[in-house]
UniProtKB/Swiss-Prot annotation:
Gene name, Swiss-Prot/TrEMBL: hyfD
Organism in which the protein naturally occurs: Escherichia coli (strain K12)
GO cellular component labels: formate dehydrogenase complex; membrane; plasma membrane
Top-rank EC class of the record's enzyme: oxidoreductase
Entry GO MF terms: NADH dehydrogenase (ubiquinone) activity
Name under which the protein is recorded: Hydrogenase-4 component D
Length: 479
């Protein structure tokens, strides 16, 4: 398993080098090839882990004396999230080969070596972060994802794109200071950077380590007060918005917080309390910011901020003893990644074909572009938690856990009621836009829509299927 894990981690970086020095006309082909090879290695790793009865393995790769600097953790959670980030990386790379062409009506632009190279580096960095068994390893890949996000958000090189990229880099880097604090404190208290050593922390050191990780998580996952970068990051090409801002980069914060909870053991309840309060505030504020949005990608960005808030709320609940909340939150990472990626790529399909992503200009999509129309419907129902789509099987465990804990912690009851109201209101708002955009007589922009390339259609079909079955995959794997 060690060799498979290392190969999965290193292949995207090797691919980025190959893409960088290849002729531009071959960049997309090399990008897809290395993303596919990485996916095959990832699936082989998961198969080997399954055949070993899913017994967790921790491997130290770099150490100085007894100090673990870098290592790998292969367990049910890391392999599940690895599947998400690598498989979606492949889908986004395939989608990009159709989207980044001169036939794109919104952005007629052929994909370059730079695009595919940074996308591959990002896939590798996400694999490295998910598999890291030390805080130092997490920190390294945390920073690499930040650098890649700057390069990819600014890809079109407009003034607005460059400002948005710099804003994302600065805010997420401010968040990373929390991870530096956590790593330094962990080392000073335990003599190692291993995540497993967090269970040995006592006294004030616990607050510094877990508080630092939570602060870093807020920055990377666009939670209040560091949410401002994500809506502006929609200047990126839409496949990048789908991968970075729905499936991978924004999940980094949630994942490192979840990993700390899994490995930490005795976490101060004040960390859980602060996490819940800030998550609740983010969810409610994010919903209010839905209301004025007419740009489909900005609407989805604010939706992502609220959905990430749900994940932080569930993880914070788990600190008070709810195993159901922990597993529900991890499943939420998986299910939201597929459903929201679908939604973003539907937005990309509409902008490619119609030349706009402004919702008031889109009508009658189902008549002219049936596949994006179906995708819009499935994604809207999935992210708002309607059965039988995957989002329902993420939200329901969090509601069950929250109401169960409210018997012991009465303050949770009004919080859960507020979350129920937000959930229903969010459903109503997306159904409102669905009714305006998908059925009816096609608007001028939609009536004149160009056909979608086969690569884009293929990815939309796969994501529609995954929006139905990913919850089954997550629940089965975590058992």
């Amino acid at each position: 398993m060690e060799n498979l894990a290392l190969t999965t981690l290193l292949l995207p970086f090797i691919g980025a080098l190959v893409v960088s020095f290849s002729p531009q006309r071959r960049a997309a082909e090399w990008g897809v090839l290395f993303a596919a090879l990485t996916t095959l290695c990832m699936l082989s790793l998961i198969s080997a882990f399954y055949q070993a009865d899913k017994v967790a393995v921790t491997l130290t790769l770099v150490n100085v004396g007894d100090v673990a600097l870098f290592g790998l953790v292969i367990d049910r959670v890391s392999t599940l999230i690895l599947f998400v980030v690598v498989f979606l990386g492949l889908l986004v790379t395939i989608y990009s080969t159709g989207y980044l062409t001169d036939k794109n009506r919104e952005h007629p632009h052929n994909g370059t070596n730079r695009y595919y190279a940074f996308l591959l580096v990002f896939i590798g960095a996400m694999a490295g972060l998910v598999l890291s068994s030390t805080l130092l390893g997490q920190l390294l890949f945390f920073e690499i994802t930040g650098g890649c996000s700057w390069a990819l958000i600014s890809y079109y090189q407009s003034d607005k794109a460059q400002r948005s990229a710099l804003k994302a880099l600065l805010i997420t880097h401010i968040g990373s200071l929390g991870l530096y604090l956590a790593a330094a404190t962990l080392f000073l208290q335990t003599g190692t950077f291993a995540l497993s050593a967090m269970s040995e922390l006592h006294g004030d050191a616990r607050y510094l380590v877990y508080g630092g990780i939570l602060f870093a998580a807020w920055g990377k996952s666009a939670q209040l007060p560091m949410q401002a970068w994500l809506p502006d990051a929609m200047e990126a090409p839409t496949p990048i918005s789908a991968y970075l801002h729905a499936a991978s980069m924004v999940k980094v914060g949630v994942y490192i917080f979840a990993r700390a909870i899994i490995d930490g053991g005795n976490i101060p309840h004040v960390i859980g309390g602060v996490g819940m309060v800030m998550a609740l505030v983010t969810i409610l504020y994010g919903f209010l910011m839905y209301l004025p949005q007419q740009d489909m990608k900005r609407l989805l960005a604010w939706s992502t901020i609220t959905q990430l808030g749900w994940m932080f709320f569930g993880l914070s609940l788990s600190i008070f003893g709810s195993r159901l909340a922990l597993e529900g939150s991890i499943a939420y990472i998986v299910n939201h990644a597929f459903a929201k990626s679908l939604f973003f790529l539907v937005a990309g399909a509409l902008s490619y074909s119609c030349g706009t992503r402004l919702l008031p200009r889109l009508r009658g999509v189902l008549h002219t572009l049936p596949l994006p129309g179906v995708g819009f419907c499935v994604a809207a129902l999935a992210i708002t938690g309607v059965p039988p789509f995957n989002g329902f099987f993420s939200k329901f465990p969090l509601f069950a856990a929250g109401f169960a804990l409210s018997v012991e912690y009465w303050i949770l009851l009004p919080a859960m009621i507020l979350l129920m109201i937000e959930s229903v209101a969010s459903f109503a708002w997306f159904i409102r836009w669905f009714g305006r955009v998908v059925p009816g007589k096609p608007s001028e922009a939609v009536a004149d829509a160009a056909p979608l390339p086969g690569s884009m259609r293929l990815v939309l079909i796969v994501l529609i299927v995954m929006s139905l079955i990913s919850s089954v995959i997550a629940a089965t794997w975590l058992q």
